């Protein structure tokens, strides 16, 4: 099944779906290997992995380059956290074209102004685009996509900027009417009060996605009862990776040794495995000339060895079934 079709199925199936954050090829592959059915390509996590702020400091082309590695490394759908679409409707059209070329299944666009500010940063200006302008972005995205299953998700930031339920519902309804395949209702409260109120009042057939980063203590069963479509675990891969790296770095710095830490970290062999080293070894056997040719003789000479198995002493190499 196409990745776009997989994502659309996740959004519209009656069971609660989950998307897990990833920010590069390695984390995306780990997400799939763990068993998740879809990936959230987080703007915060990608920015953090590049060492920049989540304020559109990473260009959209840099994000797309990372997405290409993520897509190549996985077979499950990726939903991009596309911020505001990186500009106006025309930037959105260009973005959709490039995402489809890289087999990205969908994009989530928020109704704030470019350049955006992360929704959880306190004290910074959080300005919303007009509903009409944002509806134009949604229509432009839907008109641009070639694959009918490519998903455009409209992220509603009304609660984030301090507006009430009526404003959130009005915006979400307008975005659904403009053609959004789903709406994402966002909240920075520590409880799910706003989300519960929204879901109880939502009467559209368009599925609703949530991001419980702040109201993480809410039991998942509550989301099922509310008929939420999809839950996004939005930044927990990058945050756990940061904690693990900081712990390892601190230990090595303090002890000036890797003896204590080595048993606690992933072995190099596991790194090779997730990179697909075994597949490359098999491919070398199929495609490299002379890979499986038996050695019939050895000429000892000065200079670098041309023998592939360089780690084996020449006296131990098999010639005609016997070592020298």
What residues fall within each predicted segment?
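A short, charged/proline- and glycine-enriched loop
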Residues: 14-16, 292-295
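Residues at the C-termini of beta-strands that transition into short coil/loop
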Residues: 212, 253-256, 301, 320
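N-terminal glycine-rich phosphate-binding loop and ensuing alpha1 helix
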Residues: 293-324
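Alpha-helix N-cap/helix-start capping motif
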Residues: 24-25, 235, 322
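Active-site loops and adjacent core secondary-structure elements that bind or stabilize anionic groups
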Residues: 232
């Amino acid at each position: 099944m196409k990745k776009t079709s997989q994502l659309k199925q996740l959004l519209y199936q009656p069971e609660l779906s989950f998307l897990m954050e990833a920010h590069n090829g390695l984390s995306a592959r780990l997400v799939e290997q763990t068993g998740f059915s879809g990936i959230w390509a987080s703007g915060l996590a990608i920015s953090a992995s590049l060492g920049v702020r989540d304020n559109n400091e990473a260009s959209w082309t840099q994000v797309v380059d990372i997405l290409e590695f993520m897509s190549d490394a996985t077979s499950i759908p990726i939903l991009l956290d596309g911020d505001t679409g990186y500009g106006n409707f025309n930037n959105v059209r260009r973005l959709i074209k490039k995402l489809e070329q890289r087999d990205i299944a969908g994009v989530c666009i928020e109704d704030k102004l470019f350049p955006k500010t992360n929704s959880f940063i306190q004290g910074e200006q959080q300005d919303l685009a007009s509903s009409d302008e944002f509806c134009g972005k949604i229509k432009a995205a839907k008109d641009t996509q070639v694959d009918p299953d490519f998903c455009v998700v409209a992220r509603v930031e009304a609660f984030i900027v301090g507006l009430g339920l009526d404003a959130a519902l009005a915006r979400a309804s307008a975005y659904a009417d403009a053609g959004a395949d789903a709406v994402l209702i966002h909240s920075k409260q520590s409880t799910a009060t706003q989300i519960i109120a929204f879901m109880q009042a939502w009467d559209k057939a368009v599925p609703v996605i949530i991001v419980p980063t702040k109201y993480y203590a809410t039991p998942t069963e509550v989301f099922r009862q509310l008929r939420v479509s999809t839950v996004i675990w939005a930044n927990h891969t990058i945050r756990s990776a940061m904690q693990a790296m900081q712990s390892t770095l601190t230990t090595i710095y303090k002890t000036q040794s890797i003896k204590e830490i080595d048993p606690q970290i992933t072995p190099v062999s596991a790194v090779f495995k997730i990179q697909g080293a075994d597949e490359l070894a098999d491919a070398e056997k199929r495609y490299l000339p002379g890979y499986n040719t038996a050695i019939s003789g050895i000429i000892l000479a000065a200079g670098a060895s041309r023998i592939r198995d360089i780690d084996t002493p020449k006296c131990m190499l098999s010639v005609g079934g016997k070592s020298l």
